[in-house]
């Protein structure tokens, strides 16, 4: 496997860099500082685009328009204008207000709904979800890079893919991890005796923090504002956060044990 990055699809160019809470650890993901968004009036309800293939242009400042294609994975219940999108050739999951963001141009629905893929080994899938892992990637000149992270969940729509995040870069990625596991590139780390596995409570997770606004102070003293948009069922102390100035989805443990 290649080191996680944001490989550009055909006709795509790197978007402008935005402020980050953490270093990118030699990653080349696309970043941007978001500007104010305003809704566009609509006389009728918009169609459900979750599961659809989409394409659109992207216009950032004075940069030339670039073209993007991807799959809409989910619509965020706490903020229905926000969609999670897996773009072709990009390892990260992006969060964008597709109908409101003025940088999104000529949004087109390419297909009504993609056929849901199936996992080859349901038992193995259940085994890796919620686990701390070591994920091996091929670095420069054939070297091996080891990334420690956590498998968060099976991705929606694209069921053969899994959400994962890393200690080096706590944003939301997705990969076909069962293939990596079978090829020896994904290894489940032994559970620490000091931190017993979290048991899932019956009836799902408590979502008391979902929808809450959070403030993050960066190393330079500047602050960024975001919203908690999702709680990870397999690890209830772990949440997804969408910051106003970035379209990446950040993954943080908000209930750190002292």
Swiss-Prot record:
<feature type="site" description="Histone H3K4me3 and H3R8me2a binding">
    <location>
        <position position="169"/>
    </location>
</feature>
<dbReference type="GO" id="GO:0007276">
    <property type="term" value="P:gamete generation"/>
</dbReference>
<feature type="compositionally biased region" description="Basic residues">
    <location>
        <begin position="28"/>
        <end position="39"/>
    </location>
</feature>
<keyword id="KW-0053">Apoptosis</keyword>
<feature type="region of interest" description="Tudor-like domain 2">
    <location>
        <begin position="129"/>
        <end position="178"/>
    </location>
</feature>
<dbReference type="InterPro" id="IPR003671">
    <property type="entry name" value="SPIN/Ssty"/>
</dbReference>
<protein>
    <recommendedName>
        <fullName>Spindlin-2B</fullName>
    </recommendedName>
</protein>
<feature type="site" description="Histone H3K4me3 and H3R8me2a binding">
    <location>
        <position position="180"/>
    </location>
</feature>
<dbReference type="GO" id="GO:0005654">
    <property type="term" value="C:nucleoplasm"/>
</dbReference>
<comment type="subunit">
    <text>Interacts with C11orf84/SPINDOC.</text>
</comment>
<feature type="region of interest" description="Disordered">
    <location>
        <begin position="1"/>
        <end position="49"/>
    </location>
</feature>
<feature type="region of interest" description="Tudor-like domain 1">
    <location>
        <begin position="50"/>
        <end position="99"/>
    </location>
</feature>
<comment type="function">
    <text>Involved in the regulation of cell cycle progression, this activity is related to the inhibition of apoptosis following the removal of essential growth factors. Exhibits H3K4me3-binding activity.</text>
</comment>
<keyword id="KW-0539">Nucleus</keyword>
<dbReference type="GO" id="GO:0140002">
    <property type="term" value="F:histone H3K4me3 reader activity"/>
</dbReference>
<dbReference type="InterPro" id="IPR042567">
    <property type="entry name" value="SPIN/Ssty_sf"/>
</dbReference>
<feature type="region of interest" description="Tudor-like domain 3">
    <location>
        <begin position="210"/>
        <end position="255"/>
    </location>
</feature>
<comment type="similarity">
    <text>Belongs to the SPIN/STSY family.</text>
</comment>
<dbReference type="GO" id="GO:0006355">
    <property type="term" value="P:regulation of DNA-templated transcription"/>
</dbReference>
<dbReference type="GO" id="GO:0035064">
    <property type="term" value="F:methylated histone binding"/>
</dbReference>
<dbReference type="GO" id="GO:0006915">
    <property type="term" value="P:apoptotic process"/>
</dbReference>
<feature type="region of interest" description="Histone H3K4me3 and H3R8me2a binding">
    <location>
        <position position="138"/>
    </location>
</feature>
<feature type="region of interest" description="Histone H3K4me3 and H3R8me2a binding">
    <location>
        <begin position="246"/>
        <end position="248"/>
    </location>
</feature>
<feature type="site" description="Histone H3K4me3 and H3R8me2a binding">
    <location>
        <position position="176"/>
    </location>
</feature>
<feature type="compositionally biased region" description="Low complexity">
    <location>
        <begin position="1"/>
        <end position="23"/>
    </location>
</feature>
<dbReference type="GO" id="GO:0005829">
    <property type="term" value="C:cytosol"/>
</dbReference>
<dbReference type="Pfam" id="PF02513">
    <property type="entry name" value="Spin-Ssty"/>
</dbReference>
<keyword id="KW-0131">Cell cycle</keyword>
